[in-house]
């Protein structure tokens, strides 16, 4: 995997190439962009570039160091995360900062990757700050977050931010054609619009649309029929779900509503249910519902309980 594997983002890639040519790849990067924007792809490329032993452009993608990075088997790439915890435990951060002073096993750098840096609490960020300020020569931090503002200003000021951008329509469409050769082009184009130009998001939309969740089918029926009592019957059991169970349901509802809205502008609906929504509800209703679910997904990432979120949606989606 070379830098060219990151689609679009030409300005960002030129900047990285210039830093590399000058030997100035920093010790702290902040990679920002929404889920599906390519943050994780860029992180893998950066890890490989920093460990690559080939002359010329790095990463070469074929040397032993690159292969280990790309296979997820490099001993000097440390992922700091606990997917089962909403907030990254401070102990994990402290352990990483202690481990930082043990020299690399075989690589040129020891890289600490934080795939959910936005889920570091203030205490964890302050612990990390001390190591980011004065790392050993081989120490490197890669922090991934949706927005730079999710981290403390003191952290941001010590990192080089690399912001991922949406792909040009032609680039995105070409990539989707390669990945979904049997899907009609109008459907690919509609997925790209709904994804805001981000490849990973568009791929998720196309995969998720292959099957409608039971809660989504029930939601469409209740929403199109304007029956609040039916909507309550859909949302009430969802109040008992865990956050990770509720998120894909609300994400699919959002996708259905967005497709319904864009179909009013001439884009083909991704599912028949989207056309049903577009026929049953006016644009103002659909727009309000999209905003309600956007806020619900935002609250889901905060401290609001699934019960409170579903209760609010019972009122907002009538």
Task: Report residues per predicted region.
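Charged, glycine-rich active-site and insertion segments that engage polyanionic ligands
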Residues: 1-49, 65-68, 137-139, 146-252, ...
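Clamp-loader machinery-focused feature within the broader ASCE/P-loop NTPase space
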Residues: 2-123, 127
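Conserved Walker B
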Residues: 116-120, 132, 148
